[in-house]
């Protein structure tokens, strides 16, 4: 599959300052990257930071706000990674000084780049922990309902399996980035979601609505 026709999925998160505005700015900047065409942006979900409070590695901090962006790219994974690292820097992230598992003004993960595979210290594609994270799978399913990961696993089936394992995140639906008051955010229309308020998605129900089979 050529890069021009490959689905690219990116996971974005933030929990420092005005996290919604940070996410909105990141989406806008992604759309300005040469060779990247943003197609759809998920609803915003809130999740507790990891490790949890009962873990000795836990760092006290606010919950994260997370989204998944679906795009098409004519650039490869390495060039896209370089672009996302630069966007993180522009939005205030300092990877050299930040605390491990600490708060982040912005975090951009390359989750899937078509059927490309990389396994290097600086870049692993597809992201190795997609199937372990409801805050990735739920918004990914929203923007990529028929999505199939490079290993052949359907995104919906991965979400059902995660829910059945009992290790799914305490994920809350927050709203949409279109609720952010900014004149500059250029965002494509996406699946409908509540404009405000919190609700916990029923993960198995969400997945089954998108055709998962167990």
Please tell me what each predicted stretch does.
Residues 35, 50, 59-64, 81-214:
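Flexible, gly/pro- and Lys/Arg-enriched active-site loops
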Residues 2-10, 16-105, 114-115:
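Nucleotide and nucleotide-moiety/phosphate-recognizing core
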């Amino acid at each position: 599959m050529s890069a021009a026709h490959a689905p690219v999925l990116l996971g974005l998160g933030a929990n420092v300052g005005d996290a919604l505005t940070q996410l909105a700015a990141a989406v806008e900047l992604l759309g300005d990257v040469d060779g990247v065409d943003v197609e759809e942006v998920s609803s915003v979900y809130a999740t507790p930071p990891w490790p949890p409070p009962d873990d000795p590695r836990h760092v006290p901090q606010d919950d994260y706000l997370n989204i998944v962006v679906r795009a098409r790219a004519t650039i490869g994974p390495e060039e896209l990674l370089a672009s996302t690292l630069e966007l993180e820097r522009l939005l205030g992230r300092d990877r050299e000084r930040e605390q491990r598992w600490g708060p982040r003004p912005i975090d951009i993960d390359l989750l899937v780049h078509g059927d490309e595979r990389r396994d290097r210290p600086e870049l692993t594609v597809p992201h190795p922990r997609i199937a372990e994270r409801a805050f990735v799978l739920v918004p990914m399913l929203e923007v990529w309902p028929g999505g199939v990961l490079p290993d052949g696993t359907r995104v919906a089936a991965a979400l059902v399996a995660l829910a059945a394992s009992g290790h799914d995140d305490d994920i809350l639906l927050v709203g949409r980035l279109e609720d952010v008051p900014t004149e500059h955010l250029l965002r494509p229309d996406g699946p409908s979601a509540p404009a405000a308020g919190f609700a916990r998605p029923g993960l198995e129900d969400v997945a089954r609505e998108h055709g998962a089979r167990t």
